């Protein structure tokens, strides 16, 4: 019986145009910077707002590699803090300092979810 793991490892990585990848990361970074104080978004929400639905992992990558971003405003699905340990505590404290309310362990998304403006089409 063959293992699915071997098939997965043998997949050829998609070739990504470095210029397009850089543009994508910059758009994601700009989107994160545009989340106002007191509002939050999910990894998937940021990806959609940046024009890359399904690129939630790329949002996490940008947050890990960029400095000066309001990282605390990006949460897991449903408003859950996905960080562990002291980082999770720091994220919650930063959000509470911005006036974000929690319901148990999750942010009250009805009150605090950021709704980006949609660009008008011509």
Where are these regions (language model features)?
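Nucleic acid-binding interface residues in structured DNA/RNA-binding domains
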Residues: 2-122
